[in-house]
């Protein structure tokens, strides 16, 4: 789902803050010993325990059945490029997307797996491409059927509007499955005049599939470590992925900064930092050599989570990648520079 500028780069940067598992190595280990523990009363209060070492939190997702959460997600991306393709002038592209959607807790299994009924109510997109001597701007609103609404680029957005589908999420915040998209696909096929054969339909479903929708929604769901975490303690995780064609190791550091109890509700705040290590800075294929000559990357984020309600209430992340690449072939070479920044802002509206 959801086309982005510099897709390969953006995938890495967005997912960096959302793929949080419990297998990361912690800088401060959480003691699971329950001796001398004191628990508060209230819904999900057993997730917060005080002992002789401090306040310890089990980071679990425990909403109540039939609860409904309404969210706004804003994703802003700015890409700046200087290359021979842009006439060695700076080309600036921006994409500003707002998603409005709801999640209803449809079922909670015996193992704690939560099934949400999800529905997108509105999506609007502002895209701009500008250089020193020209600028092009386009605005899409899923609720306004204008000339932009009918463009092929937006079929995927139109097709999912107001259609219910389902997401299964583990107690640790990882989306394990997206299903129930049959009506969405039916809308897509109809918008193309039902002219597609079986192979073309499968190709379209693959390009706008469960994985793409899951990647968007996972940005909201915060993934937690398996072990309990003390206030002011940290944990880390690293995993390998790619930026463009270059293999990298993303190193994620998290810190439980705050725990509050107010009006019989527990809320926590987590701070996050991202560092990127390029494992290989030169790649050769049959036609060309790609070499990173300069790279600066990183990111930060904060997450506010309501333990009592079992939901993210706010999340802000920002990432930056600044990279210079030398392309060589047949004794000739050119240089390109690209800077991509992303800002993600998620708010619980209700």
Ranges and model annotations:
Residues 25-350:
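Signature of exported/secreted
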Residues 19-22:
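C-terminal motif of bacterial Sec signal peptides marking the signal peptidase cleavage site
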Residues 1-10:
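Bacterial N-terminal signal peptides that target proteins for export
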């Amino acid at each position: 789902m959801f086309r982005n500028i510099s897709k390969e780069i953006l995938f890495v940067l967005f997912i960096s803050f959302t793929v949080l598992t419990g297998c990361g190595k912690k800088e401060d280990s959480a003691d699971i010993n329950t001796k001398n523990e004191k628990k508060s009363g209230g819904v999900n209060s057993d997730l917060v325990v005080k002992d002789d070492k401090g306040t310890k939190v089990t980071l679990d997702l425990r909403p109540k059945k039939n609860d409904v959460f309404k969210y706004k997600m804003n994703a802003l991306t700015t890409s700046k490029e200087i290359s021979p393709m842009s006439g060695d002038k700076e080309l600036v592209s921006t994409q500003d997307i707002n998603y409005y959607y709801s999640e209803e807790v449809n079922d909670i299994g015996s193992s704690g797996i939560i099934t949400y009924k999800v529905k997108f109510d509105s999506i609007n997109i502002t895209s701009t491409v500008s250089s020193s001597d020209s600028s092009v701007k386009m605005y899409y609103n899923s609720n306004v059927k204008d000339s932009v609404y009918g463009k092929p680029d937006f079929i995927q957005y139109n097709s999912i509007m107001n259609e219910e589908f389902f997401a299964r999420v583990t107690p640790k915040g990882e989306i394990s499955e997206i299903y129930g998209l049959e009506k969405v696909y039916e809308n897509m096929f109809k918008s193309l005049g039902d002219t597609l054969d079986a192979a073309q339909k499968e190709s379209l479903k693959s390009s706008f599939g469960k994985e793409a929708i899951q990647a968007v929604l996972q940005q909201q769901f915060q993934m937690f470590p398996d072990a309990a975490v003390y206030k002011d303690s940290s944990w880390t995780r690293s995993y390998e992925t790619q930026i463009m064609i270059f293999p990298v190791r993303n190193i994620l550091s998290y810190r439980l900064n705050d725990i509050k109890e107010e009006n019989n509700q527990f809320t926590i705040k987590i701070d996050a930092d991202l560092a990127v290590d390029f494992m290989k800075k030169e790649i050769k294929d049959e036609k060309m050599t790609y070499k990173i000559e300069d790279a600066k990357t990183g990111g930060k984020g904060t997450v506010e989570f309501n333990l009592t309600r079992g939901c993210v209430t706010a999340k802000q992340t920002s990432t930056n990648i600044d990279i210079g690449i030398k392309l060589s072939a047949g004794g000739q070479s050119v240089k390109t520079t690209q800077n991509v920044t992303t800002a993600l802002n998620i708010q619980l509206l209700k």
